[in-house]
Amino acid sequence: MSTAQSDALTFECETGNYHTFCPISCVSWLYQKIEDSFFLVIGTKTCGYFLQNAMGVMIFAEPRYAMAELEEGDISAKLNDYGELRRLCLQIKKDRNPSVIFWIGTCTTEIIKMDLEGIAPKLEAEIRVPIVVARANGLDYAFTQGEDTVLAAMAQRCPLNLKNQSDNTSLKTSPHIPLVLFGSLPDPVVTQLTMELKKQGIFVSGWLPSKRYTELPVIKEGYYVAGVNPFLSRTATTLMRRRKTKLIGAPFPIGPDGTRAWIEKICSVMNVKPIGLEDREKAIWASLEDYISLIRGKSVFFMGDNLLEVSLARFLTRCGMTVYEIGIPYMDKRYQAAELALLKATCDKMNVMMPTIVEKPDNYNQVDRIRDLKPDLVITGMAHANPLEARGINTKWSVEFTFAQIHGFTNARDILELVTRPLRRNLSLSELGWDVYSKQS
Amino acid sequence: MKLAYWMYAGPAHIGTLRIASSFKKVHAIMHAPLGDDYFNVMRSMLERDRDFTPVTASVVDRHVLARGSQEKVVENITRKDREESPDLVILTPTCTSSILQEDLQNFVSRASIETEADVLLADVNHYRVNELQAGDRTLEQIVTFYMEKAKSNNQVLTQKTKTPSVNIIGAVSLGFHNQHDIAELKRLFQDLDIQINQIIPENASVQDLKKLPSAWFNFIPYRETGLMTARYLEKEFNMPYVDITPMGIVQTAACIRSIQQLVNALGAAVDYEKYIDEQTRFISQSAWFSRSIDCQNLTGKKAIVFGDATHAAAITRILHQEMGIHVAWCGTYCKYDEEWFKDQVQEFCDEVIVSDDHGLIGDLIAKTEPAAIFGTQMERHIGKRLNIPCGVISSPVHIQNFPLSYRPFLGYEGTNQIADLVYNSFTLGMEDHLLEIFGGHDTTEALSIGISAVDSINWSEEAQKELNKIPGFVRGKVKRNTEKFARDCSKNLITLEVMYEAKEKVSS
């Protein structure tokens, strides 16, 4: 069976001319996740325009985020940064009374070298609201990496001891060294993954981030930590280096294969023998058969924009798809080591070529390759989706994978629901015989 | 610094990109950090564009901060020249890149030595002008560039056409109902026997710009884009222009009369009065509609208007003059055009508001409590919250404001569309009366037995909480599926475990 056609993983790096969301977009899901927070994005009209358009209707629901829009006086340092931020934060405190204010630094604050990290502690002491600074800018990061910068900053704020000894019970009863998971997930998914581990006798003593800033988990030296998303390498580094925790390097719980591998790795570190995992995985695969039969033997091309690409490619390979290319904004080979190993093992197992991983892709070149390869499905950003559809190529917007629930056994079906949707829809349309809708070549 | 949740007009480079991407074979390169190419998403999503948006970024990253972006920008311009062979490449700075104070003009000059295409640097200041002003300026810049070029090659077509002809200036990508408006204008000019010389910038070629002066006059349908170009052409080539927006019956007539006066002054002998009368009374439905008894119910109803200068002014006039509606206040976010706006609407409303602060507009609406709002998508959402109907009449807009069907706001068909929009925004006349007489809708509770009420399945407190977290529009389905699953495996308490088991096993 496993006559491996592939040797090692091949990595390429292109020009970085690709479309992705600005990392400040993390504000849109993090403000909903952290219920007592307020996010202040310190930037220009361009940042604000992106947020208001990308977040669509959400903007009208009185969001707990706003722009501190820089004006000419701020750029030329005619105005005093401290005074300006103080004025705005006092107003936010008065209007919303949050438990924490996040300052999201942008490209502009980087270029004019506004000392947010220096100002924050002083202002925090003065107005008595915690201020956490994250530099989620487009000079350094792409899309989901924004969350990474915020969580890395939050990791420093996790308490060393519980203030209230009475709710210490969960830690005391834990039969193993405490485990803290990191990555922002919708509450139902948090519950699902926590329960999945509980079945194996593993207790999650906290999540970074928690539902409220005031409930950030205790993180002490020697604790174990595990990531749930592939784009959290800075957070992982911070937890290891600054908080002296031990990182469990595992594939990510995306797809039944990933979820099982994730749990198994955690169990092995905790010296727990996993029970019933194999059967559970099998049952999930069986329940997915109706969707898998639609994509088995088909090909997929990831243009790359959100760093979930390797995990999704690995899952889709296991579903029987051929992956032509994995475009990805940034590849941390250390943090994703276990995921990359599982990708390789999956390719061997399914007897398919290892796809090329293209870091910092060049969208123009990619469209050329897509024309040559004619994949059955292209997973891409919204800038390219309609033009590709008009040329008869099935596409799925990559952004949906970041907003849908895709983690754990329970949500494997949701990933396939997304992946198969264009195929299911276009199957009926192709019978009409109009595949190309553009007069350009 | 300004605390801002929402803005009516976007940053300057968006205006430049809207102009550049409207022309054929013009490619824009943004000097911008990763993620600033959101314009491509808007084109592709809102306009459902079938083709790749001709905009790429020359990405500003850490390396650029350290070393400058000269090589990169020049390389990106020459690369696009090879790949797409455009007629023109426009380099546009963004908010971020403009503070780097690199000599972009120098890069443009250097690149243009190596390119087949012309190369221009968009002349916009990100901290002083907004999207609309930048668009106006960029169009003028491109037209000026090609007119100057044609002049030095002696290629300007100054010979006027034999019969009256016009250039329509200001049809722009991502403009509010622009494409429909332009189609309607073409029809109008055809009716008036005026030949259309050129329509710019949408779908135009920069190579044809040298033919602009052969038209008798220029027509500027929207205040926001085209005026600067019209003034340039007036100064350089002595071309007159008409800038009365033909929106509404009265203004359309005023616009046509102004055209008549203009072409007659240039030697034509036309009389459009009969055409105006025929269109107004018998072809367009809206004048008759205003007169019909149904429309009487709108008399004196209170409305407010907010939008860009063109649309807010025109709609205010229509509501007041043509429909007898009381406009409590009308406003615009085009602060730079305040004087013109006030002058236009002063006599048609109680108060004029000029502000780009949506919080202030929201508060004012709440205080005014109008029967209907005519505004942008922002006012629509304010209306939703206050339970006041809203007709969307101006950008900024969402995807539903890019309708597939024919919906012009300009010309005689436009008057029909606007009449429908206004009428449908108010609670219908008769319904209104009946509700008043009978004191609201029938409130007797409908007798119905829900499926889930048949047998008793209990939800644990935890599961119930989880259920409540599920968004409202799918909650019912999840509840039914879960209960069916529990019933099928004879469980009468739904716990979190049961809930997720159901999700895994019941294929939705």
From Swiss-Prot, chain A:
| Top EC group | oxidoreductase
As one GO molecular function, the record gives: 4 iron, 4 sulfur cluster binding
Q: Where in the cell is it found?
A: Plastid, Chloroplast
Among its keywords, does the record have Iron?
Answer: yes
Cell membrane as UniProt keyword: no
Which keywords describe this protein according to UniProt?
A: 4Fe-4S, ATP-binding, Chlorophyll biosynthesis, Chloroplast, Iron, Iron-sulfur, Metal-binding, Nucleotide-binding, Oxidoreductase, Photosynthesis, Plastid
EC number(s) stated in the UniProt entry for this protein: 1.3.7.7
Which reaction is the catalytic activity of this chain?
A: chlorophyllide a + oxidized 2[4Fe-4S]-[ferredoxin] + 2 ADP + 2 phosphate = protochlorophyllide a + reduced 2[4Fe-4S]-[ferredoxin] + 2 ATP + 2 H2O
List the record's Gene Ontology CC terms alphabetically: chloroplast
**Annotated pathway, please?**
Porphyrin-containing compound metabolism; chlorophyll biosynthesis (light-independent)
A Pfam entry, by short name: Oxidored_nitro
Physiological role:
Component of the dark-operative protochlorophyllide reductase (DPOR) that uses Mg-ATP and reduced ferredoxin to reduce ring D of protochlorophyllide (Pchlide) to form chlorophyllide a (Chlide). This reaction is light-independent. The NB-protein (ChlN-ChlB) is the catalytic component of the complex.
**Self-association and partners:** Protochlorophyllide reductase is composed of three subunits; ChlL, ChlN and ChlB. Forms a heterotetramer of two ChlB and two ChlN subunits.
Tell me the protein's name. Answer: Light-independent protochlorophyllide reductase subunit N
Q: Record the organism.
A: Pyropia yezoensis
High-level lineage: Eukaryota, Rhodophyta, Bangiophyceae, Bangiales, Bangiaceae
Swiss-Prot record, chain B:
What is the required cofactor set for this protein?
A: [4Fe-4S] cluster
Q: Where does [4Fe-4S] cluster bind?
A: D36
Which Gene Ontology molecular function entries are recorded, alphabetically? Answer: 4 iron, 4 sulfur cluster binding; ATP binding; metal ion binding; oxidoreductase activity, acting on iron-sulfur proteins as donors; oxidoreductase activity, acting on the CH-CH group of donors, iron-sulfur protein as acceptor
Q: Which residue spans traverse the membrane? A: none
The entry's substrate-binding residues are G429, M430
For this protein, the record's InterPro entries field holds:
ChlB/BchB/BchZ, LI-POR_suB-like_C, Nase/OxRdtase_comp1, P-CP_red_C, Protochl_reductB, Protochlorophyllide_Rdtase
Keyword terms, alphabetized: 4Fe-4S, ATP-binding, Chlorophyll biosynthesis, Chloroplast, Iron, Iron-sulfur, Metal-binding, Nucleotide-binding, Oxidoreductase, Photosynthesis, Plastid
Matching Pfam families, A to Z? Answer: Oxidored_nitro, PCP_red
Q: Which family does it belong to?
A: Belongs to the ChlB/BchB/BchZ family.
Q: What is this protein called in UniProt?
A: Light-independent protochlorophyllide reductase subunit B
- Pathway as given in its UniProt record: Porphyrin-containing compound metabolism; chlorophyll biosynthesis (light-independent)
The EC number of this protein is: 1.3.7.7
Which GO annotations describe the biological process of this protein?
A: light-independent chlorophyll biosynthetic process; photosynthesis, dark reaction
Gene3D superfamilies the UniProt entry points to: 1.20.89.20, Nitrogenase molybdenum iron protein domain, Proto-chlorophyllide reductase 57 kD subunit B
The record's note on quaternary structure and interaction partners says: Protochlorophyllide reductase is composed of three subunits; ChlL, ChlN and ChlB. Forms a heterotetramer of two ChlB and two ChlN subunits.
In the UniProt record, the gene name given for this protein reads chlB
Active site: residue positions? D294
| Functional note | Component of the dark-operative protochlorophyllide reductase (DPOR) that uses Mg-ATP and reduced ferredoxin to reduce ring D of protochlorophyllide (Pchlide) to form chlorophyllide a (Chlide). This reaction is light-independent. The NB-protein (ChlN-ChlB) is the catalytic component of the complex.
Any single Gene Ontology cellular-component annotation: chloroplast
